[in-house]
C-alpha cells in the first residue's frame, strides 16, 4: 500500500511538472508608471509565465524616469526599460549597459500639432514655438526632420514643457511638441475634444528605431535568467496578440487607475507595436541610428554594435 501511495505521489509530481526549487528573484525597473506600453511584462506576471520560467520578478515604477538605466549600470537592479536613442548616448558616456531585448519595436515618438491648426506641413513650423521634454535627442530628431525643409533650430523657439505635452499644445502655449507618444497624446487630445495630427519621425527622414528596450549590465547580468525573462515576455506578447480583449481585462484589472478610456484606447494602439520576437534585433538598423546620432553630433565615436545590443537567444 505504501509503495502504491508513493507511486501515485510521483505521478502527481510528474503530471504537474512544478519545479521543487525556489524561484530566482529578478528586479525590473520600468521607465515610467505602469501603462499599456508595459503590457507584455504585466501579462507575463499575471499569467504566470515568469513563474513557469523559474523567476520571481519584482516590477518597480521609478520615482525618477531617468534613474533606471543608471541603477542597472550600478548593479542595483537586473533589468531596466529604456529607449534605444538614449542607450546609444548612455554607452557613449561610459555606462555599462547593453540591450538584451525589445519591448516596443517601432518609434512611438512623433511631432504633434493641432489638426485644424496653422501647421499643415513641416515647412510651416518656421518661426513657431515647439515644446519638448528631453533635451539632446529630441533636438537632433527635430533637426533631422526640419533641415530638408530649410529650417534650422535658429528658426524656431524651443520651449521646455516638461512632460505636459498635449496640454501645452491644446492651451496654445506652443504650436507643436516633439516627444509625444502617438499611442497616448493623440488619444488624450481626442478624449478632450481636440484633434491632433502626428508627423511620424520614420516618415520624415529619421531612421527607424526600437522605442522601448530591455537593458542590463553586461558585466553583472545572468544570461540564463535574462534568456528566461525574455522568453516569458515573448509568451505574453503572443497571448496579447491572440487575445486582445481578454488581455486588456487582465492588464487593467491589476490597478484601478488603468481602468479608463485613455488606457483602453492606448492598449489597442500599442498592440501592433510590441516586439513579436523580443530577443531578436536588426544589426543594420542599430548601426543606421548610431550613424544618425554621430552625424547629429550627439556622439563622437561609434561603438561596435555587439557592445550595444545582443541576442540572448543565440548565446
What positions do the PLM features span?
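Positively charged n-region of N-terminal signal peptides that target proteins for export
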Residues: 1-5
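Bacterial N-terminal signal peptides
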Residues: 7-17
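Pocket-lining segment of extracytoplasmic ligand-binding domains
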Residues: 85, 163-254
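Periplasmic-binding protein-like
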Residues: 103-113, 194-219, 230, 266-270, ...
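Secondary-structure end/capping motifs
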Residues: 222-298
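Conserved C-terminal helix/tail region of periplasmic/extracytoplasmic solute-binding proteins
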Residues: 287-315
Amino acid at each position: 500500500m505504501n509503495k502504491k501511495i508513493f507511486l501515485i505521489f510521483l505521478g502527481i509530481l510528474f503530471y504537474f511538472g512544478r519545479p521543487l526549487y525556489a524561484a530566482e528573484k529578478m528586479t525590473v525597473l520600468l521607465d515610467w508608471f505602469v501603462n499599456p506600453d508595459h503590457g507584455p511584462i504585466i501579462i507575463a506576471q499575471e499569467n504566470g509565465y515568469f513563474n513557469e520560467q523559474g523567476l520571481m520578478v519584482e516590477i518597480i515604477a521609478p520615482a525618477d524616469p531617468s534613474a533606471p538605466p543608471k541603477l542597472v549600470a550600478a548593479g542595483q537592479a537586473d533589468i531596466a526599460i529604456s529607449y534605444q536613442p538614449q542607450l546609444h548616448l548612455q554607452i557613449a558616456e561610459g555606462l555599462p549597459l547593453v540591450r538584451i531585448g525589445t519591448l516596443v519595436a517601432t518609434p512611438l515618438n512623433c511631432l504633434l500639432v493641432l489638426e485644424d491648426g496653422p501647421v499643415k506641413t513641416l515647412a510651416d513650423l518656421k518661426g513657431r514655438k515647439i515644446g519638448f521634454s528631453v533635451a539632446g535627442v529630441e533636438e537632433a530628431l527635430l533637426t533631422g526632420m526640419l533641415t530638408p525643409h530649410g529650417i534650422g533650430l535658429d528658426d524656431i523657439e524651443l520651449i521646455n514643457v516638461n512632460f505636459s505635452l498635449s496640454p501645452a499644445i491644446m492651451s496654445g502655449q506652443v504650436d507643436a511638441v516633439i516627444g509625444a507618444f502617438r499611442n497616448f497624446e493623440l488619444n488624450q487630445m481626442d478624449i478632450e475634444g481636440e484633434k491632433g495630427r502626428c508627423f511620424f519621425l520614420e516618415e520624415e527622414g529619421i531612421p527607424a528605431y526600437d522605442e522601448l528596450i530591455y537593458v542590463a549590465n553586461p558585466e553583472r547580468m545572468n544570461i540564463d535568467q535574462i534568456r528566461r525573462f525574455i522568453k516569458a515576455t515573448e509568451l505574453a506578447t503572443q497571448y496579447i496578440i491572440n487575445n486582445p480583449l481578454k488581455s486588456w481585462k487582465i492588464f487593467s484589472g491589476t490597478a484601478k487607475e488603468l481602468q479608463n478610456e485613455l488606457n483602453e484606447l492606448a492598449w489597442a494602439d500599442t498592440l501592433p507595436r510590441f516586439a513579436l520576437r523580443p530577443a531578436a534585433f536588426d544589426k543594420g538598423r542599430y548601426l543606421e541610428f548610431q550613424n544618425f546620432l554621430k552625424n547629429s553630433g550627439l556622439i563622437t565615436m561609434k561603438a561596435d554594435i555587439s557592445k550595444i545590443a545582443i541576442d540572448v537567444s543565440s548565446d
